[in-house]
Amino acid sequence: MADESNTGSIAAAVAPNADVKAPAAKKKRSPRRQKAVAEPRRAVSETPAAKPRRYSEQQRKEKLKLIETQVTEGKVTLKDAIKSAGISEQTYYQWKRTVKPVEQKAEKRLPTGEELADLVRLEEENQRLRKLLAEKLRAENADLRKRLGLD
């Protein structure tokens, strides 16, 4: 308690530290950068989109044939052959799908007179063989029943 009444020594203790520095000014920050405005992404190539083009059936068949020959010769891959033909992969597969049914219909031909006669003869032989097989199986079943004593 004696120290509390002695205020002079405190003043003397504070006096030597009178050179206490004022708090340093805070470092100023630079203003925040604004967020970058997202620009819409463009296509990889800066060229304008290709104008839709119509190909005739003959042109389509030629391009498909060109692609097939390039691939079968082993010169390029299918993807590269399609690009070199100047069409997209989707177009290639659509064309290929539409050409196939037409070719399949063309491949089917009607049988001639000789072929019809052969077909009729084969069908008659087939019927005769089926009857023989059925008779043989019936006889075998009857024989087995007799042996087992079921009949």
Swiss-Prot record:
<feature type="compositionally biased region" description="Basic residues">
    <location>
        <begin position="24"/>
        <end position="35"/>
    </location>
</feature>
<keyword id="KW-0678">Repressor</keyword>
<dbReference type="GO" id="GO:0004803">
    <property type="term" value="F:transposase activity"/>
</dbReference>
<feature type="region of interest" description="Disordered">
    <location>
        <begin position="1"/>
        <end position="61"/>
    </location>
</feature>
<dbReference type="GO" id="GO:0003677">
    <property type="term" value="F:DNA binding"/>
</dbReference>
<keyword id="KW-0536">Nodulation</keyword>
<keyword id="KW-0804">Transcription</keyword>
<dbReference type="Pfam" id="PF01527">
    <property type="entry name" value="HTH_Tnp_1"/>
</dbReference>
<dbReference type="InterPro" id="IPR009057">
    <property type="entry name" value="Homeodomain-like_sf"/>
</dbReference>
<comment type="similarity">
    <text>Belongs to the SyrB family.</text>
</comment>
<keyword id="KW-0614">Plasmid</keyword>
<keyword id="KW-0805">Transcription regulation</keyword>
<dbReference type="GO" id="GO:0006313">
    <property type="term" value="P:DNA transposition"/>
</dbReference>
<dbReference type="InterPro" id="IPR002514">
    <property type="entry name" value="Transposase_8"/>
</dbReference>
<feature type="compositionally biased region" description="Low complexity">
    <location>
        <begin position="11"/>
        <end position="23"/>
    </location>
</feature>
<comment type="function">
    <text>Seems to affect the transcription of cya3. May be negatively autoregulated.</text>
</comment>
<protein>
    <recommendedName>
        <fullName>Probable transcriptional regulator syrB2</fullName>
    </recommendedName>
</protein>
